[in-house]
């Protein structure tokens, strides 16, 4: 119910609205997969025109989305993909709660499992990423991670090896960042081995070893076919094989008494060592990337440190996500038996503090720890006392559900879906109508007829709703050769240089927004210097078009030349600017492209 509570926001005006930009590219890739099912494209000419782009996401998640839409492939592929894509996060969210209950039961009592499940069902951080319409790979990854951890916690029970193998394999083929999951599973296994008997320790090590070896073998053909050469964390590559072999060697070290596993572990270790020279630098870059230390993240709020989410120290984002649950978790984590859970919490919370999107990853072990803690407290204190204390611990998280003045951006029902607050739907509908369907819409291997140059965060919307190729998009620089060049168009002063970029990327339409305040942030994303003052900023071609139109303007003792663009669409919505009210969005056609 909590995950479906935004139904009227997602299914509105006869359309399906996905929350956030990345979900729209998941839809496009699934749409491309439907054209040639079961082959999932690894590159796409519709992005980063004219070079095209490598897709950083492994194929499994988008292949799953396409497979679910197969019955409607001939009749209504776009509408069915949108509806399935909107429902899938909520379904995965319910599955995640069930897996949390199972894992908690393996770690503690039946009552602790039910409490952890109840917490997970309503905990805002878990609900936020599994709300109806919040299409992305995150809940899929968390479910695979839980499956692998269930296997480790269940050892030496029957099926534990299969669970770990399935979890790690699905994770690797579903998200390039799943190396984080491999590390968490390995750390969890090492901690559990430390607290277990010698017989159980061998089974844990065997499960970790076999699961990673099998996952490495299954992933190998995909790595060899991947457009990402060498080793990199940005896409499925030899770096992932290195991580899997390293985790397999760690498993063999735990089960060193098993001679066959020890020999296999030695072979895995040699393989990891052989790949280490090409993987060390990607590993360092991956750590910095996971920690949010990359220039391109300057303009992406969810990649900022949790306590500095908006550029200044602020506890509220952390309190709304977690409440005081970390304090409650200490009650459960102080015992040696819960060392595996404590290890998981420390790793996940550390990642969340560095990179706020990992709050979702950290919420799962916190819910489990909270369930165990409340169970222990109920054994020592009255129910009323424990209920009051628990309510106080989660009180800050209620901001996500209740309307509190000043916190609308954190509330599930008051926050605005990004695409609907941007005037992008109208612009996308216009772009879709201006010409016949582009051949590259259904075939990612042919060159698009022309492209649209729009602010990076509009790229996926334009590709899916507008059905037009783009130069830059929310993939940022990952696999996108045109990203830096396209960003320079939006942040650097100089009309002639901007026109060269337009010609270089086969641009026919330009989308502009009056957003002077974002220039420093966008410039930082490519390591560029922003304009120093308003006089210089208005020489940034998109700012000229957004505030003044394409005509010549004399201002600030300077002359701003007329630009070879024709305005073809503008939004009804307006916003105030330094020169009066201006449209929230405008679309221009490049005159030389007529």
Placement of each model-derived feature along the sequence:
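Active-site lumenal/periplasmic loops and adjacent helix-entry segments of GT-C-fold
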Residues: 4-107, 111-119, 123-146, 179
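Aromatic-rich transmembrane-lumenal/periplasmic boundary elements in polytopic membrane proteins
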Residues: 1-55, 262-302, 406-411, 415, ...
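Alpha-helical transmembrane segments at the extracellular/periplasmic loop-to-helix junctions
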Residues: 237-254, 261-342
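Extracytoplasmic
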Residues: 390-594
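Membrane-embedded helix bundles of polyisoprenyl
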Residues: 2, 88-106, 112-197, 208-226, ...
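Perimembrane helix-loop-helix junctions
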Residues: 181-264, 375-380
């Amino acid at each position: 119910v909590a995950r479906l509570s935004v139904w009227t926001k997602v299914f509105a005006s006869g359309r399906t609205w996905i929350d956030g930009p990345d979900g729209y590219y998941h839809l496009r890739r699934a749409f491309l997969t439907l054209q040639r099912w079961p082959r999932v494209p690894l590159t796409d000419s519709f992005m980063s025109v004219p070079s095209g782009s490598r897709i950083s996401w492994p194929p499994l998640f988008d292949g799953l989305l396409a497979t679910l839409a197969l019955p409607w492939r001939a009749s209504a592929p776009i509408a069915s993909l949108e509806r399935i894509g909107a429902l899938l996060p909520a379904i995965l969210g319910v599955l995640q709660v069930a897996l949390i209950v199972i894992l908690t039961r393996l770690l503690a009592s039946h009552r602790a499992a039910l409490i952890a499940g109840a917490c997970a069902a309503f905990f805002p951080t878990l609900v936020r990423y599994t709300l109806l319409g919040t299409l992305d790979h995150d809940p899929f990854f968390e479910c695979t991670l839980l499956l692998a951890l269930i296997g480790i916690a269940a050892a030496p029970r029957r099926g534990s090896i299969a669970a770990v193998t399935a979890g790690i394999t699905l994770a690797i083929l579903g998200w390039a960042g799943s190396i984080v999951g491999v590390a968490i599973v390995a750390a969890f296994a090492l901690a559990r081995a430390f607290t277990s008997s010698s017989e159980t320790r061998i089974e844990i090590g065997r499960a970790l070893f076999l699961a990673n070896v099998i996952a490495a073998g299954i992933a190998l053909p995909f790595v060899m076919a991947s457009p990402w050469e060498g080793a990199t964390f940005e896409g499925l590559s030899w770096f992932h094989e290195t991580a899997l072999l390293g985790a397999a060697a760690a498993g063999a070290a735990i089960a060193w008494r098993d001679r066959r596993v020890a020999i296999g572990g030695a072979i895995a270790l040699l393989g990891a060592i052989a790949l280490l020279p090409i993987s060390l630098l990607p590993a360092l870059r991956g750590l910095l990337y996971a920690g949010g230390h990359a220039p391109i993240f300057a303009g992406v709020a969810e990649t900022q440190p949790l306590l500095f989410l908006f550029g200044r120290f602020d506890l509220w984002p952390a309190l709304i996500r977690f409440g005081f649950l970390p304090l409650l978790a200490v009650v459960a984590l102080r015992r040696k038996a819960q060392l595996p859970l404590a290890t998981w919490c420390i790793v996940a919370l550390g990642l969340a503090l560095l990179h706020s999107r990992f709050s979702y990853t950290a919420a799962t072990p916190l819910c489990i720890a909270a369930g165990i803690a409340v169970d222990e407290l109920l054994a020592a204190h009255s129910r009323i006392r424990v209920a009051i204390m628990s309510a106080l611990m989660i009180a800050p998280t209620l901001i996500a559900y209740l309307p509190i003045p000043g916190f609308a951006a954190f509330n599930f029902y008051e926050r605005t879906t990004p695409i609907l607050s941007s005037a992008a739907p109208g612009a996308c509908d216009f772009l879709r109508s201006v010409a016949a369907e582009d051949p590259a819409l259904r075939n990612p291997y042919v060159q698009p007829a022309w492209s649209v140059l729009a602010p990076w965060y509009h790229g996926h919307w334009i590709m899916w709703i507008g059905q037009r190729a783009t130069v830059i998009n929310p993939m940022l620089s990952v696999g996108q050769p045109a990203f830096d060049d396209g960003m320079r168009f939006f942040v650097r002063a100089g009309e002639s240089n901007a026109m060269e970029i337009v010609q270089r990327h086969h641009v026919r339409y330009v989308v502009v927004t009056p957003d002077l305040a974002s220039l420093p942030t966008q410039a930082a994303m490519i390591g560029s210097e922003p304009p120093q003052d308003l006089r210089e900023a208005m020489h940034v071609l998109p700012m000229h078009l957004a505030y003044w139109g394409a005509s010549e303007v004399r201002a600030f003792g300077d002359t701003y030349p007329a630009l070879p663009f024709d305005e073809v669409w503008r939004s009804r919505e307006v916003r105030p600017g330094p020169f009066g009210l201006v449209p929230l969005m405008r679309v221009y056609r490049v005159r030389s492209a007529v």
